[in-house]
Amino acid sequence: METQDHTLYVLLGPTGVGKTDLSLDIAERLGSPIISADSRQIFRELPIGTAAPTPEQRAKVPHLFVGTHSVRDYYSAGMYEVEVLEALKELFRKYRGVLLTGGSMMYIDAVCRGIDDIPDPFPEVREELYARYAAEGLDGILAQLRLLDPDYYAKVDRRNYKRVIHGLEICLSTGRPFSSFHRHEAKERPFRIVKIGLYREREELCKRIDARVLEMMEQGLEEEARAVYPLRHLNALNTVGYKEMFEYFDGSIDRAEAVRRIQRNSRVYARKQMTWFRRDSTIRWFHPEADKGTVLTLVT
């Protein structure tokens, strides 16, 4: 049974900051498994490019929501919310504290705050919009979105065709503005939530990210990306590390440039993560090495 005597510890931070090592120490202190909050580690075909926990690390501490789905599978933050809450019901029967760790902002919010109950669009509406996009580009779709949902139009990234199309397909399928489904209050959870954020100075983090990309290449990222190249159209592969390698395979850039772009885009993603996390005043921030002892004390 979940009660306020049970605690979900959320270890979060940007890519490359050092969450994995500290998460293992925290989980061992708690004596419980780790729940991954990484929207790409959930796909079994992508262990290298997503820096998924190794078999040795998973043998040391069980990990949930790692390698459980194929990139061919549809998976969403809403599905993740439901499945994690079900898993926590069982885990809290055995453990007073459980660790959730990752850097996927939407997945963390899904568990901690809940996400909006947005209806699925009609398949024929989605197909028609994607056909329009392929034939005409995004301008006409943007104009229609602006007419039907000016609030969402004002804040959506208008270069991201998937988000633009998603907003319009919900408008057309439901007869309501997509923005009208967005809630602003968090759902209540029957357990305490303690958020632990990890940070490093920007220069230090960038060096770690660049080095990690080189390490991924040595581990076989190129071969991993080639194996899923025939599936490049899937949303799961619209991901840093893979889309750059696909450009290399297409012949539009060389291998060295692909690596540089992975490093650059990983640094950009880390900045976006920190921008998102800084909006949450409930996060307590720590350095993963200098403050390690304080963090471990916090979870005991």
Curated annotation (Swiss-Prot):
Coiled-coil features, chain-numbered ranges: none
UniProt region (Interaction with substrate tRNA), positions on chain: 38-41
Site (Interaction with substrate tRNA): S104, R126
Binding site for substrate: T15, G16, V17, G18, K19, T20
Catalyses which reaction(s): adenosine(37) in tRNA + dimethylallyl diphosphate = N(6)-dimethylallyladenosine(37) in tRNA + diphosphate
RNA-binding as UniProt keyword: no
NCBIfam families according to UniProt: miaA (TIGR00174)
Family under the similarity heading: Belongs to the IPP transferase family.
Highest taxon in the source lineage: Bacteria
Species this protein is from: Porphyromonas gingivalis (strain ATCC BAA-308 / W83)
Functional note: Catalyzes the transfer of a dimethylallyl group onto the adenine at position 37 in tRNAs that read codons beginning with uridine, leading to the formation of N6-(dimethylallyl)adenosine (i(6)A).
Family annotation (Pfam families): IPPT
Protein name stated in the entry: tRNA dimethylallyltransferase 1
A single BP term in Gene Ontology: tRNA modification
Alphabetically ordered keywords of this record: ATP-binding, Magnesium, Nucleotide-binding, Transferase, tRNA processing
Essential cofactor(s): Mg(2+)
Gene Ontology molecular function: ATP binding; tRNA dimethylallyltransferase activity
Binding site for ATP: G13, P14, T15, G16, V17, G18, K19, T20
PANTHER family for this protein: TRNA DIMETHYLALLYLTRANSFERASE
Subunit architecture: Monomer.
SUPFAM superfamilies, alphabetized: P-loop containing nucleoside triphosphate hydrolases
InterPro entries the record matches: Dimethylallyltransferase, IPT, P-loop_NTPase
EC number of the protein: 2.5.1.75
